[in-house]
Curated annotation (Swiss-Prot):
InterPro entries membership: Kinase-like_dom_sf (IPR011009), Lsacc_core_hep_kinase_RfaP (IPR017172)
Family: Belongs to the protein kinase superfamily. KdkA/RfaP family.
Any one GO molecular-function label of the UniProt entry: ATP binding
Source organism of the structure: Escherichia coli
Cofactor(s) required, per the database record: Mg(2+)
GO biological process per UniProt: lipopolysaccharide core region biosynthetic process
Active-site annotation: D162
Gene: waaP
Pathways per UniProt: Bacterial outer membrane biogenesis; LPS core biosynthesis
EC class of the enzyme, as a word: transferase
Name the record gives this protein: Lipopolysaccharide core heptose(I) kinase WaaP
Any single Gene Ontology cellular-component annotation: plasma membrane
Subcellular location: Cell inner membrane
Recorded effect of pH on activity: Optimum pH is 8.0-9.0.
Length: 265
């Protein structure tokens, strides 16, 4: 299966896209045995390529023993991108996808997305909030937007599996006005797609988002604000119905604090 949008539909017409992908040169972000990620220029624009070259038997066994489906190609990210865009969640724009082969050990696939630039990850944008607090209105605006995005992502049957603030990109310029605000969720190659996200995987995403935000100076009130938007329910109901989630999040936070203290000794 191959799906090409412009400019690749024109540039690669009559050519083998899998051979063309091999010739792409650019800034390599990740080079693994079975996956390559690079940023390259084409027709005056910047793009990201993720090229999957099968997987290893060791990786398949490791994931199955952990009761997880291994990532076997680029199709997850391609499908997740399109489902998110269908439900109005800002994300990457996919311009090319290809997949061939039935054997998971040798299957080859690729995905090309537009480079989202200029942007800054929320991890970097919020890095100094603990010592240099932002405008309260801006902070609440960002919390509301991320909570809405994650809620809509889960409602669409998608859980991210790497749901951290570094994977939410704030589009620039942003001066604090709501009409300028745009945030895109990225790195969906491990995402899972179903008709409904199981509670276990929902909680993993929420806990990941929580502990990746622990060092940016958020208050307890900020966390409650996020939860009220995400669950679309009164706080007293959330505290009653989500005791398991809250306990897991606090246990995770405690482990991180203890590990940080040990490393500083």
């Amino acid at each position: 299966m191959v799906e090409l949008k412009e400019p690749f539909a024109t540039l690669w017409r009559g050519k083998d896209p899998f051979e063309e992908v091999k010739t792409l040169q650019g800034e390599v972000f990740r080079e693994l045995e079975t996956r390559r990620t690079l940023r390259f220029e084409m027709a005056g624009k910047s793009y990201f390529l993720k090229w999957h070259r099968g997987t290893t038997l060791k990786e398949i066994i490791k994931n199955l023993l952990s009761l997880r489906m291994p990532v076997l190609g680029a199709d997850r990210e391609w499908n997740a991108i399109h489902r998110l865009r269908d439900v109005g969640v800002d994300t990457m724009y996919g311009v090319a996808f290809g997949e061939k082969g039935m054997n998971p050990l040798t299957r080859t696939s690729f995905i090309i997305t537009e480079d989202l630039t200029p942007t800054i990850s929320l991890e970097d944008y919020c890095a100094d909030w603990a010592t240099n607090p932002p405008d309260v209105r801006v902070k609440r605006m960002l919390i509301k937007r991320v909570a809405t995005m994650v809620r809509d992502m889960h409602a669409a049957g998608i859980n991210h599996r790497d749901c951290y603030i570094c994977h939410f990109l704030l589009h620039l310029p942003f001066s604090g006005k709501e009409e300028e605000l745009k945030i895109s969720v990225i790195d969906l190659h491990r995402a899972q797609l179903r008709t409904r996200v199981p509670r276990r995987w929902r909680d993993k995403d929420l806990i990941g988002l929580y502990f990746s935000s622990m060092n940016i100076g958020l208050t307890q009130r900020d966390i409650w604000r996020f939860m009220k938007v995400y669950f679309a329910a009164p706080l007293k109901d959330i505290l009653k119905q989500e005791q398991g989630l809250l306990s897991q999040a606090e246990a995770k936070a405690t482990k991180i604090r203890e590990r940080t203290i040990r490393k500083s000794l």
